[in-house]
Amino acid sequence: MRVLPLALLVGLLAVSDAKVLGKCEFARLLETRYNLSRNDIKNWVCIAEFESSFNTAATNRNRNRSTDYGIFQINNKYWCGSDYGKNVCGIPCSDLMSDDITAALRCAETVRRATERYRGRGKGYTAWVAYNSKCKKRDLDQYMAECWSRGSNSIFPF
């Protein structure tokens, strides 16, 4: 019986580490902290929304027994360190679930560049299922309109 309360406490602590960002908050972070271009921001925002709902601690177990981690849902079969995969990004998968998204963004860029080398220039985001099904054919400027002011390259609505 004492195991159940301990398990609940551990579960609550794990959940409390998660940070769920808002769409415009995430876009602002990508612009101000990481100095990304508007084109990159709109793609990463769309991917993050449909992969993780902007949850930095999201995980998803796949049919092939691999797991996707973090706000960009990066897979452990190739990209992050686990007993399962190749760890191309050179980081433990747990780093992808931090509230500080630096490691997740760096690894996501590694995935994008590697995919472009394999599939061709401009095809890097196709590594994400969400990009192919939700973002690729969407008007991403319209999608981001609530975050960006008109006629400006800034995402600040003033």
UniProtKB/Swiss-Prot annotation:
For this protein, what reaction is catalysed?
A: Hydrolysis of (1->4)-beta-linkages between N-acetylmuramic acid and N-acetyl-D-glucosamine residues in a peptidoglycan and between N-acetyl-D-glucosamine residues in chitodextrins
The set of disulfide-linked cysteines is C24-C147, C46-C135, C80-C93, C89-C107
What is the enzyme's main class?
A: hydrolase
- Keyword Secreted annotated: yes
Q: Where in the cell is it found?
A: Secreted
Q: Where is the signal peptide?
A: 1-18
- The active site of this protein is located at E51, D68
Q: Name one Pfam family in it.
A: Lys
Q: Which residues form the C-type lysozyme domain?
A: 19-150
Q: What keywords appear on the UniProt entry?
A: Antimicrobial, Bacteriolytic enzyme, Disulfide bond, Glycosidase, Hydrolase, Secreted, Signal
GO MF terms here are: lysozyme activity
Enzyme nomenclature, EC number: 3.2.1.17
Q: Which InterPro entries match?
A: Glyco_hydro_22 (IPR001916), Glyco_hydro_22_CS (IPR019799), Lysozyme-like_dom_sf (IPR023346)
- GO CC, alphabetical: extracellular region
Name the protein family: Belongs to the glycosyl hydrolase 22 family.
Beyond the main fields, what else does the record say? Lysozyme C is capable of both hydrolysis and transglycosylation; it also shows a slight esterase activity. It acts rapidly on both peptide-substituted and unsubstituted peptidoglycan, and slowly on chitin oligosaccharides.
PANTHER family documented for this protein: LYSOZYME C
Question: Know the name of this protein?
Answer: Lysozyme C
Q: Which organism is it from?
A: Penaeus merguiensis (Banana prawn)
